[in-house]
UniProtKB/Swiss-Prot annotation:
The gene is gpsA. It comes from Mycobacterium avium (strain 104). It catalyses: sn-glycerol 3-phosphate + NAD(+) = dihydroxyacetone phosphate + NADH + H(+); sn-glycerol 3-phosphate + NADP(+) = dihydroxyacetone phosphate + NADPH + H(+). Gene3D superfamilies: N-(1-d-carboxylethyl)-l-norvaline Dehydrogenase, domain 2, NAD(P)-binding Rossmann-like Domain. Its EC number is 1.1.1.94. Pathway: Membrane lipid metabolism; glycerophospholipid metabolism. It holds the Pfam family NAD_Gly3P_dh_N. The keyword Membrane does not apply. One of its GO terms (cellular component) is cytosol. This is Glycerol-3-phosphate dehydrogenase [NAD(P)+]. It is an enzyme of class 1 (oxidoreductase). One of its GO terms (molecular function) is glycerol-3-phosphate dehydrogenase [NAD(P)+] activity.
Length: 341
């Protein structure tokens, strides 16, 4: 009986800013192990209670958080797995995990992106590689550095099984980090992937010096595009005005710490996308998601002008100026049911 009552051990896979922040939160609630590739990062976490590479020297992590570079140790001891690796490495880590992980261990993704080539959401990859393991996503307006510094924030844990979601939500909840639950995994994952593309669009606008009214226009119409595609793919319309949708869209479009907004600004400064990506310390998921989103839009017969223009700049040689001229040239129709910008 005592063994059944013990605190579940959370294993966070990934050493980036958000994975480390979530690992530190979980460590304040119970036993937590973080797997990282870099020995230097592991030593920094274990000895200095910091992840200086991704969170700087000022953010102090929970002193009960332990890091390891031993993947087998992490996989073999996990009661709950939290996936903090980028979308391009997600499947590979899961495949390695499948060799070691016990049955039924829940897998919670932190990734707000889609897999290029298959266009799959992260929970779909979990279901394919780790059948029988409950899969979900923790999503919301969460700039990692702010959460790590203790500013109040919130997220939503999306899982099909609400009893399990409620139980797991307590692992992530603190006095200043609120965690809600939902069963709309599709909506939460699509909102997380889409907002990155739209943040690039807003970043382009910053580089052009657009006004606040124009910025609000782009964000509002982006929410409409996000909702149209998300609902077409099976998401609930109630998800998109919430934390995973509008909340995350606002912070990713407006925060100076937003990687995707930064990409848009750099594109507006005339830098090639490859040069921008090479100069960044972390992944901007919107760069990879833009073409995938347009494939979905074409599949469902949807017109998505903002996503279209971002894809054109990133993948088809268009300029930021041409993108915004293209949006303004759109003829406005019905605000809800119209197909244009």
């Amino acid at each position: 009986m005592a063994a059944q009552m013990r605190e579940p051990k959370v294993v966070v896979l990934g050493g980036g800013s958000w994975g480390t922040t979530v690992a530190s939160i979980c460590a304040r609630r119970g036993p937590t192990l973080q797997w990282v590739r870099s020995r230097e990062t592991a030593d920094d976490i274990n000895e200095n209670h910091r992840n200086s590479r991704y969170l700087g020297n000022d953010v102090v992590l929970s002193d009960t958080l332990r890091a390891t570079t031993d993947f087998c140790e992490a996989a073999n001891t996990a009661d709950v797995v939290v996936m903090g690796v980028p979308s391009h490495g997600f499947r590979g880590v899961l495949t390695e995990l499948a060799r070691e992980l016990r049955p039924w261990v829940p897998v919670v993704s932190l990734v707000k992106g889609l897999e290029q080539g298959t266009n799959m959401r992260m929970s779909q990859i979990v279901e394919e590689v780790l059948p029988g393991h409950p899969a979900g996503i923790l999503a919301g307006p969460n700039i990692a550095r702010e959460v790590a510094e203790g500013y109040a924030a919130a997220a939503v844990l999306a899982m099909p099984d609400q009893h399990l979601a409620t139980r797991l939500s307590g692992l992530f909840r603190t006095r200043r980090f609120r965690v809600y639950t939902t069963d709309d995994v599709v909506g939460a994952e699509m909102a997380g992937a889409l907002k990155n593309v739209f943040a690039i669009a807003v970043g382009m606008g910053y580089s052009l010096g657009i006004g606040e009214n124009t910025r609000a226009l782009v964000i509002a119409r982006a929410l409409r595009e996000m909702t149209k595609l998300g609902v077409a793919m099976g998401g609930s319309p109630d998800t998109f005005p919430g934390l995973a949708g509008l909340g995350d869209l606002i912070v990713t479009c407006t925060s100076q710490r937003s990687r995707n907004r930064h990409v848009g600004e750099q594109l507006g400064a005339g830098k090639p996308i490859d040069e921008i990506i090479a100069s960044m310390n972390q992944v901007a998921e919107g760069v990879k998601a833009a073409s995938v989103i347009m494939e979905f839009a074409n599949e469902f017969g949807l017109t998505m002008p903002i996503a279209r223009e971002v894809d054109a700049v990133i993948n088809h040689g268009s300029t930021v100026e041409q993108a915004y001229r293209g949006l303004i040239a759109e003829v406005p129709g019905h605000e809800v049911h119209g197909s244009g910008f």
